Regions:
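Transmembrane helical elements of multi-pass membrane transporters/channels
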Residues: 16-35, 137, 171, 200-204, ...
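N-terminal transmembrane alpha-helices
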Residues: 5-42, 56-71, 75, 100-107, ...
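Small-residue hotspots at the loop-to-helix junctions and early N-terminal turns
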Residues: 45-56, 135, 194, 266-281, ...
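Small-residue-rich hydrophobic transmembrane alpha-helices
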Residues: 48-108, 145-164, 271-335, 366-380, ...
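Short runs within selected transmembrane alpha-helices of multi-pass transporters and secretion channels
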Residues: 69, 137-156, 164-172, 193-206, ...
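Transmembrane alpha-helix boundary and packing residues in multipass membrane permease domains
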Residues: 21, 25, 37, 74, ...
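Short alpha-helical transmembrane segments in multi-pass integral membrane proteins
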Residues: 1-18, 76-141, 185-241, 297-362, ...
Length: 440
């Protein structure tokens, strides 16, 4: 069900909108984490390392597709808030057609160049073939990833954050059983996890389309989905390019960090894989609160309600702060039990606990940076989110390299480099926020 966010009490609205987003993304992360948990327990740390190495690579390419969806969803939210159904329909059809073509081309390119990508990443020869196979299978499912994210982001732009949650719950459950079947029963190793993931993504996409056909008349497939508006595509790319580059910048930074980690040995790579999964769970609610702020601000921006935009920003930042404190306590206190979910190797667990004790103290900083980025996305100024993310990731890699290679701090170097990156990001964002906020 769609929701008009231009009226009503803002704090309850943000909370109610955010909860399904959080649950949906946690389920999505769950079926990603299940791959790591199952291969870590039933195959070994080599397979766990292979899955972990592929994660930032596949995410980088997926985020290019998500950037297109993000740019479109901002415009869709604006047109929906302005009650302009004609432009809304043209926007949706143009985005879907362009995204399908782009995702298919990207799939072919990525599958062909997978070995070259992994060689550039300096992947250990002992796990190279295993990693290549996993990566190519995941790339084969990019078109399903795009379609689901497009329909889900469109529903959220219209105020419906619950329906995508239900599809992800079903998909996550199917993926868990699929992983167990392929890995435990068929002994297919990391390749089996990849196959299960692609099947789950395809089913999730199918559920989303069937729901829209039956329950959302505004989005039902038909002749209107064959309309291609080049002027709207240019505007979508203008928004989506900045969003895609911002997210790609984050992933390029993660790739840089992953390349540094790959030099530390399989045990550290396996530990980093596990803590990255935990980090994803920790950061996701912060990002979802920001996405709720974006949806609220985009609709109210389209409706010309500036005061509600200011109030929405303040409410969102309060939620970010509360969550930042909560997740610090959880990850600091339960660091070892969390690591034991992924692996039983004591050396790997030790590295992971060291990382979590340091990084959890800093979780409050990305809570603030995510909230600020939610504000700028909502008003359509995505260049600022790109610049601040570029500062963050550049500082991370620049600080991490000497801490690892010169001071030999090992995995402890990474949280310190993240801290430097987040501080740099805040320094880039705050002056622009203060200047922009005064105009609303």
């Amino acid at each position: 069900m769609t929701q008009d966010m231009t009226q009503g009490k803002i704090m309850p609205m943000l909370v109610h909108f955010t909860i399904p987003l959080v649950l949906g993304n946690l389920f999505q992360l769950t079926y990603n984490a299940v791959d790591s948990i199952i291969v870590g327990h039933f195959v070994g740390k080599e397979a766990l390392a292979a899955v972990g190495i592929c994660n930032p690579i596949t995410t980088l390419f997926i985020l290019f597709l998500n950037g297109l969806c993000m740019g479109a969803s901002i415009l869709i939210g604006m047109y929906y808030g302005a009650k302009d159904e004609e432009k809304l329909a043209r926007q949706m059809s143009t985005t879907m057609l362009a995204g399908l073509v782009f995702s298919l081309v990207l799939t072919l390119i990525c599958i062909f160049f997978s070995p070259q990508i992994l060689k550039f990443m300096q992947v250990d020869s002992s796990i190279f073939n295993m990693t290549t196979t996993y990566l190519q299978i995941i790339f084969a499912g990019l078109v399903f990833t795009f379609l689901y994210n497009f329909f889900a982001s469109t529903l959220r732009a219209l105020g419906d954050s619950k329906s995508p949650l239900y599809f992800l719950i079903i998909s996550s459950i199917l993926n868990i059983f699929g992983d167990l079947f392929f890995v435990v029963v068929l002994h297919a190793g990391s390749k089996g996890c990849a196959i299960s993931t692609v099947i789950s993504e395809a089913l999730c996409c199918l559920f989303c389309i069937l729901y829209i056909q039956k329950k959302v008349p505004l989005l039902q497939l038909g002749k209107k989905w064959l309309v291609f508006d080049i002027s709207l595509l240019k505007r979508t790319i203008a928004y989506g390019w900045a969003s895609a580059m911002q997210q790609a910048t984050v992933q390029l930074g993660k790739l840089g960090i992953q390349m540094i980690v790959n030099t530390m040995g399989v045990s550290v790579v396996a530990a980093f894989t596990a803590v990255n999964r935990i980090d994803d769970f920790a950061y996701t609610p912060e990002q979802n609160i920001a996405h709720s702020m974006t949806a609220l601000m985009a609709q109210n921006n389209g409706a010309g309600k500036k005061n509600r935009m200011q109030e929405g920003f303040c409410c969102g930042m309060v939620l970010e702060f509360i969550y930042g404190i909560f997740i610090f306590l959880v990850c600091f206190i339960f660091a070892k039990p969390l690591m034991c979910l992924f692996v039983q190797d004591e050396e790997v667990i030790m590295h992971g606990v060291t990382y979590l004790h340091l990084i959890s103290i800093m979780y409050i900083l990305p809570a603030f940076t995510n909230g600020i980025q939610g504000f700028f996305r909502g008003i359509g100024d995505l260049k600022i989110t790109l610049i601040s993310s570029l500062v963050n990731m550049t500082v991370r890699v620049i600080v991490a390299a000497p801490l690892v290679f010169s001071l030999h701090l090992g995995i402890e170097a990474l949280p310190y480099s993240y801290l430097a990156g987040w501080i740099g990001m805040l320094m880039a964002e705050l002056p622009l926020l203060i200047r922009t906020y005064k105009t609303y």
